[in-house]
């Protein structure tokens, strides 16, 4: 392909992804202003589908070869995370994506001690290790409890932030299919995981795992927790809106302690919320999905 054609292709990709991201929920705008941009996103997607249909009708064309190479999505075969020695047994994962911007060594230490007292080993996933590739194989590690101390989206569609820097040229297929998004964190754009990533990209099944989502707004609607449940999780606990880091740390430390003493989800949630209440700044409440479950780890 000559330089001019490659440049036109780069410009097309740039414009398409910019429009697609603009059409998604902007966490700085109220929901009422999103309808027009959603329509733009649908129109752009239809145009993209027509373009790809034309390109793939001619498999020998240079454009077809480039599209095939560039649009490869995330799946088990493309992940660089080894699953051959996946940990089994009584295990807990603490995914501390927030740790680089909002470190809380006291929280990490207390949760680790509580886990050990209850007979569990805890795998600490450092801020730089919360990558897309890590999340791809997360179900296959057979954790009993997964703690997601990550950034999220307070307004609009829920999402879980990763440690991977966003690029419109990476994992394009997953972006086009709305399985990956982006969020600004401390001046840097990061990839985020949308519900479709959990449903269609993650490998394997969770073994009735309890998911603790310390992130903002994961239970604003049932879409994200349903994706986890459909992937084999037993229950999801998270916030129904924006939450401050200090409050989520306090509440979840209490919640985790209750779970590790053998209390079920309902009882643990009741104890933690009665002790700390909603976020005093934002009013966000801690909820579980399903709404009522006595399951325990």
Please provide the spans of the model-predicted regions.
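Active-site-proximal C-terminal subdomain of hydrolase catalytic domains
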Residues: 210-297
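Short amphipathic alpha-helical segments and helix-helix/interface helices
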Residues: 112, 135-136, 198-202, 225-226, ...
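Cysteine protease catalytic core and zymogen-processing segment of caspase-like enzymes
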Residues: 155-237
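N-terminal accessory interaction module
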Residues: 1-2, 10
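A domain-level signal for caspase-like cysteine endopeptidase catalytic cores
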Residues: 66, 70-175
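Secretory targeting signatures
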Residues: 9-12, 16-17, 23-70, 146, ...
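Extracytoplasmic/periplasmic, Sec-exported soluble proteins
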Residues: 99-107, 138, 189-194, 198, ...
């Amino acid at each position: 392909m000559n330089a001019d054609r490659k440049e036109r292709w780069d410009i097309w990709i740039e414009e398409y992804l910019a429009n697609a991201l603009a059409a998604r929920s902007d966490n700085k705008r109220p929901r009422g202003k999103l309808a027009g941009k959603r329509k733009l996103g649908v129109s752009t997607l239809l145009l993209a589908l027509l373009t790809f249909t034309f390109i793939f009708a001619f498999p020998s064309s240079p454009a077809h070869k480039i599209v095939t190479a560039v649009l490869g999505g995330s799946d088990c075969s493309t992940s660089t995370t080894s699953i051959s020695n996946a940990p089994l047994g009584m295990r807990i994962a603490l995914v501390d994506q927030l740790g680089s911007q909002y470190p809380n060594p006291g929280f990490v230490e207390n949760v680790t001690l509580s886990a050990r007292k209850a007979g569990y080993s805890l795998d600490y996933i450092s801020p730089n290790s919360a990558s897309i590739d890590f999340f791809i194989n997360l179900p296959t590690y057979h954790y009993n409890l997964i703690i997601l101390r990550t950034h999220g989206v307070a307004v609009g569609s829920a999402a879980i932030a990763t440690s991977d820097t966003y690029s419109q040229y990476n994992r394009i297929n997953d972006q086009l299919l709305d399985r990956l998004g982006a969020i600004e964190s401390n001046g840097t754009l990061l990839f985020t995981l949308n519900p479709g990533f959990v449903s269609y990209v993650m490998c394997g099944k969770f073994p009735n795992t309890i998911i603790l989502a310390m992130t903002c707004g994961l239970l604003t609607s049932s879409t994200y927790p349903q994706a986890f449940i459909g992937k084999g999780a037993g229950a999801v606990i998270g916030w129904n809106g924006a939450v401050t880091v200090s409050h989520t740390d306090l509440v979840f430390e209490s919640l985790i302690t209750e779970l590790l003493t053998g209390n079920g989800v309902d009882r643990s949630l009741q104890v933690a919320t009665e002790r700390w209440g909603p976020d005093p700044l934002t009013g966000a409440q801690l909820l579980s999905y399903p709404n009522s479950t006595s399951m325990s780890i």
